[in-house]
């Protein structure tokens, strides 16, 4: 296929049918038209498989529960084997803003030109219940903030919260390979981003691209800038 404009959005799901319905509806409403949707169903037992059989314009892969890592590996492999140029990854409890994918794609070449290297881009993860604030507290220099408008003063910045609206280009996969499926549900996104940084690939958030997510997932602690953290991991 190798259509440079087509994006494959991959959603990994396990027993969260209500959230999945909202996520898929948001993807179907994206302003970016050259978009295909793939749902990787990790052995759900809550009616997800049956609901997916009724959906039009959604590619479905049903598999045993291989965790988030196994789900995203399956999605990434499908993207690569079927010739897509772009991949956007998200969990089933996230909701992409209607312009999320368009803003990520339109930002890609601009960021590459500004930083002089290949990149992985991420949407800004907003609190789905209070859309003026992010789902995670951000460290910007000596300041900490969760205010969307304050963060949107920058065109992009170099921290990310991966697999919440994460854009990966085919050339990045050529360079660093696939997600490690054996990691199941722990650390797969961190390991993949560490591998990216170790191979000279930048990680940047695009504040104009918004991905809504439950705030409680961000209560584990304040954000640590991913670049510094990953440099420690890959030594």
Predicted regions, residues:
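A conserved acidic beta->alpha catalytic loop
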Residues: 26, 41-50, 94-95
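Conserved donor NDP-sugar-binding/catalytic core segment of glycosyltransferases
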Residues: 99-135
């Amino acid at each position: 296929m190798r259509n440079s404009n087509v994006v494959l959005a991959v959603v990994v799901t396990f027993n969260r049918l209500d959230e999945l319905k909202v996520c898929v509806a948001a993807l179907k409403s994206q302003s970016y038209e050259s978009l295909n949707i793939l749902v990787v169903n990790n052995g759900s037992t809550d009616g997800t498989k049956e609901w997916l059989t009724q959906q039009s314009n959604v590619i479905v892969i049903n598999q045993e529960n291989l965790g988030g890592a196994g789900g995203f590996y399956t999605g990434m492999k499908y993207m690569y084997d079927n010739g897509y140029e772009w991949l956007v990854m998200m969990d089933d409890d996230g909701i992409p803003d209607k312009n999320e994918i368009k803003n990520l794609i339109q930002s890609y070449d601009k960021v590459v030109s500004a930083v002089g290297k290949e990149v992985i881009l991420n949407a800004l993860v907003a609190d789905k219940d209070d859309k003026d604030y992010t789902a995670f507290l951000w460290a910007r220099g000596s300041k900490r903030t969760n205010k969307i408008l304050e963060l949107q003063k920058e065109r992009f910045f170099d921290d990310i919260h991966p697999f919440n609206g994460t854009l990966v280009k085919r050339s990045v996969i050529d360079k660093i390979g696939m997600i490690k499926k054996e990691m199941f549900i722990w650390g797969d996104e961190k390991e993949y981003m560490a591998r990216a940084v170790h191979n000279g690939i930048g990680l940047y958030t695009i504040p104009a691209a918004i991905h809504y997510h439950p705030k409680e997932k961000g209560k584990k602690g304040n954000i640590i800038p991913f670049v510094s953290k990953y440099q420690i991991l890959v030594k």
